[in-house]
Swiss-Prot record:
UniProtKB keywords: Early protein
Protein name in the entry: Protein OPG165
InterPro entries tied to this protein: Vaccinia_virus_A37 (IPR009641)
Originating organism: Monkeypox virus
Domain of life: Viruses
Pfam families in alphabetical order: DUF1235 (PF06822)
Induction conditions: Expressed in the early phase of the viral replicative cycle.
Family: Belongs to the orthopoxvirus OPG165 family.
């Protein structure tokens, strides 16, 4: 099961951590056993190997106060250790995706990289905060063939004439199904004719985690992009579904260097 950046889930077996925090007045601490308890729980929820940073941070949010999480390039795990009166958490990934949720005791939330987060307390609340490297949420940046590739839209500023989405779909056994590109505000499937790749208007195959973009790319540039090698090896495969069957999806957002791209096409 894979959780998005706004889902809250229960955590078990953290009584030792809760007791330690209740009986010790510390803001930051390092404890290998506590790290393992948290990482084992997150690994179980995420079904992937999660690595925590060394420092565990204890934050106390008093009545009607707020705790602001500074956006970070790593993921952040927040656990609600105790709360009198309850608290809520607001998560904003800055791409038209804001959620406000109740944050119960003995629950955790995973904040994706670069996301903003605010914990608002209705009464004294203690939370535990730790940074984590989560493979499915790692930020990817790559520049090749006059294209800047990223896996998070927050990493680029873009104009409609320079941006596209490229996705690779494989089956559950990692066998290639298709590559698709989103440009000109619609999906295309990439097909091969006489050893050259062409975009053919198509529906999106299966569910997609891609964020919507406004895109307008000239046809010759679009065909050129379809014939490039894209850095899918750096992108985590996320589970999706197609006609109730499991598939895997890799998503990249590309921003074209239009000047160099035009020169490259003219040389071709």
């Amino acid at each position: 099961m894979h959780y998005t950046n706004m889902e809250i889930f229960p955590v078990f077996g953290i009584s030792k951590i809760s007791n330690f925090i209740a009986n010790n007045d510390c803001r930051y601490y390092i404890d290998v056993e506590h790290q393992k308890i948290i990482s084992d729980e997150i690994n179980r929820q995420m079904d992937e190997t999660v690595l925590l940073t060394n420092i565990l941070s204890v934050e106390v949010v008093n009545d009607n106060e707020m705790y602001h999480l500074i956006p970070h390039r790593l993921s952040t795990i927040i656990l609600c250790i105790s709360s009198v009166g309850g608290c809520v958490i607001s998560i904003d990934n800055d791409v038209n995706d804001k959620n406000i949720l109740t944050f119960p005791i003995d629950h955790a939330v995973i904040i994706s990289p670069l996301s903003k987060c605010v914990v608002v307390s209705k009464g004294p609340t203690t939370i535990l905060v730790v940074k984590a490297d989560i493979p499915s949420k790692r930020l990817v940046t790559s520049f090749t063939n006059d294209i800047l590739y990223v896996n998070n839209l927050s990493l680029i500023n873009y104009l409609p004439s320079s941006v596209f989405i490229i996705r690779r779909v494989t089956d559950y056994l990692d066998r290639h199904i298709c590559d698709q590109i989103f440009a000109n505000n619609k999906w295309y499937s990439i097909i091969t004719i006489d050893d050259k790749q062409y975009p053919i208007p198509s529906n999106c195959i299966g569910m997609s985690s891609a964020k919507y973009i406004n895109s307008s790319i000239e046809q010759d540039i679009l065909i050129h992009v379809c014939n490039l090698e894209h850095p899918f090896d750096s992108v985590y495969k996320k589970m999706q579904s197609y006609n109730s069957l499991p598939i895997k999806e890799q998503i990249l957002y590309g921003r074209i260097d239009n000047i160099n791209m035009s020169i490259s096409i003219s040389v071709d």
